[in-house]
Amino acid sequence: MTDIRYITAAEAAASVRSGDRVYIGTSSSFAYEMVDALYDRKDELENVTLLCSMSITPCRMFDTDWPADIPAGRKGNPFIFDTFFLGAGERSAHRKHNMAFEYTSFHLSQIDLWMREIGRPDISFLQVSRPDESGRCSFGSSGICDHKYVVEETKRGVYLESNTGSPYIYGQDNLISLDHEKVAGVLLTDHNAPELMPDKIDDISRKISKIVVAEVPDGATLQLGLGKMSTAIGYDLEQRNDLGIFSELFSQPMMVLMKNGNVTNQCKGFMDGMSVFSFSAGTQEMYDFMDHNPQIYGAPFPFVNDARNIAKNKKMISINSAMAVNLYGEVAADAIGYSQQSAVGGQLDFVKGAQWSEGGKSIIALSSSFMRNGRRRSKISLQFAPGTPVTTPRSEVQYVATEYGCVNLKVLNMSDRVRAIISLAHPDFRDQLTQEAKDAGLIR
């Protein structure tokens, strides 16, 4: 290896100019030492856009109360984040700490296009693993999903935060050499990857899990998301055998299923023998399990979330959550009203791909209601609140599950579909929903 420039975090941050667009990380692959150093320049810079997504890392950038009396982009409040997926870090930065943000609605299968047309980084900070014998670093537990495109589109310089705590993941398009032509500097660090503890499972999630798991056969290939419901479902799948994994997310329950032997990856029919994923968020135990594990295979979003690749897996079971469902069968999973919660993500990619799969199913799971200010409110309604975007259209929705059952909407005409959806609602709301459906002319 030649021409490797080792730097400090401050030297990486010094490369940023006013008006720059700076990529800083995704989920558990987040270059937070460089980001903290960039934060220290808040009184020098203006109009710096931070490109990030699904952040779970505590850092001063996201935990500072940004001044309301200084317009976003000015010195003292220079940073604006631009994202295709709001995680806990981005939500907290905006809602609790007054940080300005921009959001673009994009399917994860199109992240190469997002990076090329919208992201357009001038400078990029990437957390990567320590190098292998040949001097190449892995993009780590989550960087696999998009770092290939980050490097391709970065205009001035890529700075690597080579971390002993970032797992080395096998896969495709997931390595970068320390002497790569775009690498302007390498920072050596030694800390754990950011952890995301499993959600505490409640009774409703347990009920829904048992209903959903009944729809999953032995030999199924799985896609699961984050959250307490997905966690419950993942652990309940210990009842199944010869499972496979082809999922945008690799999660804690998937590790457990692999360790227990429930996941063998021998029945998928596509990329057998490997758990295929794009990003991950979990505990240090999970990252250690993934490190140099030949049964773990990472690939970018445009590959894993390509519905054509998803469909190549036999008995592909896609399980996603939702925030609300209306009586048409439309699904809202990323925003309610004008308040952005997360993102379109890969839900529609997997909803379509799973249904194209031989023996596959798409399942949307949600609790029927929630409590606010001591009052129960329904997640199933005649129509969404004004401003609510549709994540998955009614023409693509197949199974929907709540704690009251699971129905296949795909095979139902409109009036039968409406009645089936009402049967999934909390009993307190069924009469009201039935009357509203009659008044709207949806049922007789």
Q: What positions do the PLM features span?
A:
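Conserved alpha/beta enzyme-core scaffold
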Residues: 1-444
